[in-house]
Amino acid sequence: LDFAGSADGLILAVAPGVVTWSGPLRGYGNLIEIDHGNGWVTRYGHNASNFVSPGDYVKPGQTIALMGATGRATGTHLHFEVLYQGRHMNPARFVPGRA
């Protein structure tokens, strides 16, 4: 799910968890991946700058990155993914007003 935004807009963690990836990854550009436990993972892509590192614990609402257009992106936005047990879920189900 892509969220349009302004350059350097704040990206916040949606739930508590441990950062498992923070850095460039293929078309995602600068990516952050957070393991929330019980098989749940979120990904935040195309970031201008990442503020967290693998192994960091994050809290819900914590600023983890700045929005950008790195990787295969046509403009500034956040690419948001939700995975459960390694399978992509529809992230709109988890975003209020988007279901």
Language model features: what each stretch is:
Residues 1-99:
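Catalytic cores of peptidoglycan-degrading enzymes
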